[in-house]
Regions:
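Primarily extracytoplasmic ectodomains and periplasmic/lumenal surface modules that are beta-strand-rich
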Residues: 32-37, 47-52, 68, 144-148, ...
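Beta-strand-rich N-terminal accessory domains
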Residues: 112-203
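Alpha-mannosidase-like glycoside hydrolase catalytic domains involved in N-glycan trimming
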Residues: 21-127, 134
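Positively charged n-region of N-terminal signal peptides that target proteins for export
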Residues: 1-5
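Extended, loop-rich substrate-binding clefts of extracytoplasmic carbohydrate-active enzymes
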Residues: 184-269
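Bacterial N-terminal signal peptides
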Residues: 6-16
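Acidic (Asp/Glu-rich), glycine- and aromatic
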Residues: 261, 273-307
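Accessory, usually C-terminal, subdomains that scaffold auxiliary metal cofactors
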Residues: 298-324
């Protein structure tokens, strides 16, 4: 029998005795029986840092129960935050997605540190300020795109150049026929082209003075008081899975009181609907509540197109729909 030196024997045993790498296990419950595609899962980064001390956002691996590596994103909504104890205070959430099959009651995922730098995952959401088009702000995912209107569009044409002037705070819709990102492509080709379908979809939505798709206002029972164009913008996260941004609307007159608004948008990949939170401030400090209305344009045909839309209210949940 050949005897191994003690050092060699110790080296042979080390792989067996080495402690398992730290792992964060995430289990998500699904109470619905219906299939749910592209469900977004968020894990506070503080939980990641607690389970994986010293974890770096670009050195992670997220796997599902089948061992498939998933695309992920780490938000940083407080870019000036300090994290001297390295507990994850500087970051927001770890984000990834899962397609729940019909009847899938739960799903489990593992998050581990990785030696290699994580790949650059394809972006499926995008949001940006568009100064080259009168200060628009545009956003999209792989399903649909939107835009709204900024201060330069509302500015007067003092130079008499024929500049378009409009006060419009509704939300526009760009209908996409492709899953890749198109906002930059469409702005590059110009409005005379993106109002026609050239293969990728089109802007077929006429906002005008309406609320468009989800715009807001203050209702007094008879008339709707609406803001002007947004004044400032701030992007908090920008893909590849989730985009988050805010638009601020300065004070306007709403039935005898001054009101300001901040819109907070959350745009997720794979979703037909965005999440929009509006915060209204009564600048006069009156105690009586504001009645906020949310609008949806019934007849949205644009640029002489034939409008074909079907409006329906759903009393059970208070929602409204317009099918184009």
């Amino acid at each position: 029998m050949k005897l191994l030196p003690a050092a060699a024997l110790l080296a042979a045993l080390l792989p067996v005795l080495a402690p398992a790498a730290p792992t964060l296990t995430v289990t998500v419950a699904n109470p619905l029986a219906a299939p749910r595609a592209a469900e977004t899962i968020t894990v506070p980064w503080t939980a990641v840092a607690r389970a994986l001390p010293g974890a770096l956002l670009q050195h992670l691996e997220v796997r599902d129960a089948a061992g498939r590596v998933l695309a992920y994103q780490v938000t940083n909504v407080a870019p000036n935050a300090r994290d001297p104890q390295n507990v994850g205070a500087g970051y927001g959430d770890l984000i990834f997605q899962h397609d729940f099959a019909a009847g899938e009651a739960a799903a489990t995922f593992t998050v581990v540190r990785a030696e290699a730098v994580a790949p650059v995952f394809p972006a499926r959401v995008f949001a940006r300020f568009v100064p080259e088009r009168y200060d628009d702000f545009a956003w999209e995912n792989d399903k649909i795109a939107h835009r709204t209107y900024g201060p330069e569009l509302a500015a007067p044409d003092t130079a008499h150049t024929g500049k378009e002037v409009a006060t419009e705070s509704g939300l526009d819709v760009w209908s996409k026929k492709v899953s890749y990102l198109i906002v930059d492509r469409w702005y590059n080709k110009g409005g005379s082209h993106y109002h026609k379908d050239e293969g990728e979809g089109m802007d077929m939505f006429d906002v005008g003075k309406s609320r468009g798709c989800g715009g807001t206002g203050i209702w007094d029972g008879r008339t709707l008081a609406t803001s002007g164009n947004f004044a400032t913008w701030r992007v908090l996260a920008n893909g590849p899975i989730r985009a988050v941004f805010e638009l601020t609307y300065p004070a306007w007159e709403a039935h005898g009181r001054r009101v300001a608004e901040v819109k907070h948008f959350t745009v997720d990949a794979g979703h037909n609907l965005d999440e929009l939170e509006s915060t209204f401030t009564d600048l006069d400090g009156r105690p009586d509540p504001l009645t906020v209305a949310i609008g949806l344009t019934k007849d949205s045909a644009d640029h002489g197109q034939e409008g074909r839309s079907e409006y329906a209210a759903v009393p059970d949940d208070g929602s409204e729909t317009v099918w184009e």
